[in-house]
């Protein structure tokens, strides 16, 4: 299902890129950052270099939660053509993210990424999903902390975990997969009350 979604997204994107006039809306959450570096990396590739560069709208709020007070038409008026520097940084970030060695991501975080203002914080948060010396990642630590505080209702655990994130880090489906992995691993981190 996810593959079909991305294939459909890519087909729409490629068609639009060839026609020109692409405007990418981007907000701080990691999901948007990953889409942004993937798309801009394509524009910086051999296939994308002949296309008109896209325009970028950077907004400091979650697009899915936008209200009238966010004045989306004014945000659109602030759009700017993506710069060569932004294309290069995006390509390097995408390469580091998709590399088999996580040290490339760590090295990327030492670079100046300010031309894509939300990228560094998104990649830093993603890097926290690598296990620490105890073998667990940040999301798992947050879940264990919330559970040890007495909360056990699944929706509340998700909500409480999201309150520890700025900006929002993952959606509910991804979160439930983390919990499932914690319950079903060879050495479970969570035991369900009903077994």
Predicted regions and their residues:
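Short acidic, hydrophobic short linear motifs in intrinsically disordered regions
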Residues: 151-162, 171
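Short amphipathic alpha-helical elements of helix-turn-helix/winged-helix folds
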Residues: 142-150, 160, 178
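Long, hydrophobic/aromatic-enriched structural stretches that serve as scaffold segments
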Residues: 2-45
